[in-house]
Amino acid sequence: MGLSTFVVGMLPSYDQIGILAPVALVAMRLVQGLALGGEYGGAATYVAEHAPQGRRGLYTSFIQVTATFGLFLSLVVILLTRKVMGEDAFQAFGWRVPFLVSILLLGVSLWIRLQLSESPSFQRMVDEGKGSKAPLTDSFGKWPNLKIVILALVGLTAGQAVVWYTGQFYTLFFLEKTLKLDGALTNGLVATALLLGTPFFILFGWLSDKIGRKPIIMLGCVLAALTYFPLFKALTVAANPQLAAAVASAPVTVVADPADCAFQFDPVGKTVFNSSCDLAKSYLAKAGVTYTNQAAPAGTLAQVKIGNETLTAFDGKGLEKAAFKAQKTEWETGLGAALKSAGYPAKADSALVDRPKVIGILFLLVIYVTMVYGPIAAMLVEMFPTNIRYTSMSLPYHIGNGWFGGFLPTTAFAMVAATGNIYYGLWYPILVASVTAVIGILYLKETKDVDIDA
């Protein structure tokens, strides 16, 4: 994983090697993902099997800290790089620096691993000849264990993943892309909230040894589902009050043929949405503008109504690349000017950002993250026997975080573009967290008193 991260900083640009550039980037990201697939389950299992009974939640919570602390450190490195190099240089080539510097961490990681020995539980299992000869078959080919794997996914890690991603990554996306805060300011605000919230991973890990893993994780999912809408609306008012005021004073409506409007789900960022409806909605969604939808007769071009002004979009289907780019630029310039005259800011005014309030809201969102994530490693370890523990716990964890969590920003943006409501994408984490809470409360067993060596 460390080597693939370093290589990302060395990749040629699209101008140099064309389509091979994004292909190489995706390949390196796949290598990172495959590496992480082996990292987390092994780390959680190793630490839990070394921890004394009654302290596994506390011990494994330090693993959970590393993900958020790593994000915090990455934000600090990005902030420093931006400050030292300047924004233009950072966008041009400075973004490579953090990836290149990561090679130093690879050396530290290798040194640590060379000092480790097998856990007592695993070594005893090997000595007694009780290890699984076919861990994949034993984990996923036998219903009694497969049932637990599925339950761990839908009743535990899926909800944990969307709460984790919403509290740490979607907030970054929402502040910078939707509310249009300055990138450096966004990184600083989120980094501050992460720093304040990080000790709570350990607190909730310790508390789970006292009252159980299940109530803390389920409560985190429930609180997130109940409060995301008011918290993100409050975040808008605190971070970009001009945008909040413009939405109230100059409502926007998109009048379009429903058949002309696509669901703009684009996980790799390469799909070209070129219908008049898609061009209108895509720009508004990226500008953080809330709008209502109104159906138009079939075959008509989409229109955007801003207060008393109406702008008609163009149809980019069938246009040559250069012509499409020119018309798109002209369209977006005109739409941007109309929004500006109606009071919609192109960027958030940093002087108007209520920093303490923003940090307070972000901190609360991070607390939800610590509730669902702090105790989860211990609980996953305790759900499976030693001979298939590593394999069995890794699948629900990574499917939950990779699929349910990883697709959150893309799915949320597509939902926002489809409906015109900048908060509508929150329904995705709310629904997933709610389903996890219901299934987890009804069917998950408490595991804190399980003897994992038995």
Give residue spans per PLM region:
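Multi-pass alpha-helical transporter architecture, strongest
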Residues: S109-L116, Y228-A238, L431-A454
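C-terminal ends and interior cores of transmembrane alpha-helices
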Residues: M1-G18, V222-Q242, G334, A338-S350
